[in-house]
Amino acid sequence: MRLIPLKAAAQVGKWAAAHIVKRINEFQPTAERPFVLGLPTGGTPLATYKALIEMHKAGEVSFKHVVTFNMDEYVGLAADHPESYRSFMYNNFFNHIDIQEENINLLNGNTDDHEAECKRYEDKIKSYGKINLFMGGVGNDGHIAFNEPASSLSSRTRIKTLTEDTRIANSRFFDGDINQVPKYALTIGVGTLLDAQEIMILVTGHNKALALQAAVEGSVNHLWTVSALQLHPKAVIVCDEPSTQELKVKTVKYFTELEAKNIVGF
């Protein structure tokens, strides 16, 4: 596992965007051989999406031959609701780049058959072989996507009940009213995520410090689903200084020295 310790959240966004652009351009995607990118929502990746849009407008990257799969979607929230993850992705990213509509893959939280929808999503991912790079965030309790504590580390895309802590955290997007936050969501599984060729997780803020400690220094534990990254051969965590406050000083020092040449300029 790689850990990229940076000073501020803005640097995390820029580093992550530069890493994605590097991977896409190295891959040299075509219509017949697209680059497959997994994407999250939430506050943490906003800086990355902003930087990617700027790099696209500067001619540094094209998303014409990039296929995307999002991590999750609320159940029962209208697709055009301002807080649906579909709306989030179009407003904050898709509407500002040259991605082709048919290459955008999102879970449908309004289907009558959640099981069939989840199977369709898994099958669609498999039709591309695998996801080349999956970017994600992490919750205060260490959850990835909506794989709440005690989720199976071999889980696949499915419907999940959201914990009260998650709904309280997400209520900031619903005028602070937890009653407006859906109780269920469709989400990729931990196993789905681990199938990706590369995983990049963004961690910012002191409230994520315990989750980062669990991911880097803890044991693999289904109560901290982010710890499953330790099982992946090509995982990278990009973090800011506040999120490292629970890590041992020698851990931060080790990775700072190890990644020194990759941090210069950020």
Swiss-Prot record:
Q: Where is this site: Part of the allosteric site?
A: 151, 158, 160-161, 254
Functionally, this protein is described as follows: Catalyzes the reversible isomerization-deamination of glucosamine 6-phosphate (GlcN6P) to form fructose 6-phosphate (Fru6P) and ammonium ion.
Task: Please state how the activity of this protein is regulated.
Answer: Allosterically activated by N-acetylglucosamine 6-phosphate (GlcNAc6P).
Organism of this sequence: Vibrio cholerae serotype O1 (strain ATCC 39315 / El Tor Inaba N16961)
The UniProt keyword set, sorted, is:
Allosteric enzyme, Carbohydrate metabolism, Hydrolase
Fetch the NCBIfam families from UniProt.
nagB (TIGR00502), PRK00443.1-5 (NF001685)
**What's a Pfam family this protein contains?**
Glucosamine_iso
The protein's matches in InterPro entries, at most eight in alphabetical order, are given as:
Glc/Gal-6P_isomerase, Glucosamine6P_isomerase, Glucosamine6P_isomerase_CS, NagB/RpiA_transferase-like
Q: Which SUPFAM superfamilies match?
A: NagB/RpiA/CoA transferase-like
Its recorded name reads Glucosamine-6-phosphate deaminase
Q: Which gene encodes it?
A: nagB
Q: Into which EC class is this enzyme placed? A: hydrolase
GO terms under biological process: carbohydrate metabolic process; glucosamine catabolic process; N-acetylglucosamine catabolic process; N-acetylneuraminate catabolic process
Q: Which family does it belong to?
A: Belongs to the glucosamine/galactosamine-6-phosphate isomerase family. NagB subfamily.
Q: What PROSITE patterns has UniProt attached to this entry?
A: GLC_GALNAC_ISOMERASE (PS01161)
Q: Which reaction does it catalyse?
A: alpha-D-glucosamine 6-phosphate + H2O = beta-D-fructose 6-phosphate + NH4(+)
- Which EC number(s) does UniProt give? 3.5.99.6
Q: Which Gene Ontology terms of cellular component type are present?
A: cytoplasm
Please give the pathway this protein is involved in: Amino-sugar metabolism; N-acetylneuraminate degradation; D-fructose 6-phosphate from N-acetylneuraminate: step 5/5
Under the subunit heading, UniProt states: Homohexamer.
Q: Which GO terms describe its molecular function?
A: glucosamine-6-phosphate deaminase activity; identical protein binding
Q: Where is the active site?
A: 72 (proton acceptor), 141 (for ring-opening step), 143 (proton acceptor), 148 (for ring-opening step)
